[in-house]
Curated annotation (Swiss-Prot):
Cellular component, GO annotation: cytosol; membrane
Molecular function in Gene Ontology: ribosome binding; translation initiation factor activity
Name assigned to this protein: Translation initiation factor IF-3
Keyword hit for Ribonucleoprotein: no
Coiled-coil parts of chain: none
Quaternary state and interactors: Monomer.
Purpose: IF-3 binds to the 30S ribosomal subunit and shifts the equilibrium between 70S ribosomes and their 50S and 30S subunits in favor of the free subunits, thus enhancing the availability of 30S subunits on which protein synthesis initiation begins.
Family: Belongs to the IF-3 family.
Pfam families in the cross-refs: IF3_C, IF3_N
Alphabetized InterPro entries for the sequence: T_IF-3_C_sf (IPR036788), T_IF-3_N_sf (IPR036787), Translation_initiation_fac_3 (IPR001288), Translation_initiation_fac_3_C (IPR019815), Translation_initiation_fac_3_N (IPR019814)
Keywords annotated in UniProt: Cytoplasm, Initiation factor, Protein biosynthesis
Name of encoding gene: infC
Amino acid sequence: MRRPFKADAPVKEGPRANKEIRVPRVQLIDAEQNLGSIPIDQALRMADEAGLDLVEIAPNSDPPVCKILDLGKLKYANQKKAAEARKKQKIVEIKEIKMRPNIDTHDYEVKMKAMNRFFEEGDKVKVTLKFRGREMAHQELGMKLLMQVKDDTQEIAKVEAEPKLEGRQMMMVLAPK
């Protein structure tokens, strides 16, 4: 016979408030000043009289520091702050630009334009040069091309990984300054 599923008790997020604070004394701060160390029941009564909540600010201190404030406003402010932090967060991606050692000048300019756009967006760029057939005998052309890319982007980007040969391709990683 199957046992019924019993979910874990929900974990409460945020600071403890009012009756959840289970210590004999607290360091109390109200809107104006620090009221010092007082018994928890007196602190709860003062918060109730003010029509606000007793919120634990620093639970690890001895005695815990509590403040009389509106818990709803505190939670709202914390949510706003977290949303703002998420909005500002940018995940750095590595974009790849593929070239050949004998790339034409216009094609090179188009690739450089794309590379500059990636740097403006704050992304890293991995420049990959693919050698085919007998092109492997002329690796100096590939190195020369990667050095040209490095020189053309030195104002807006820095080299994160120097050009190196891996199998039939040469690669270099650039990061925005």
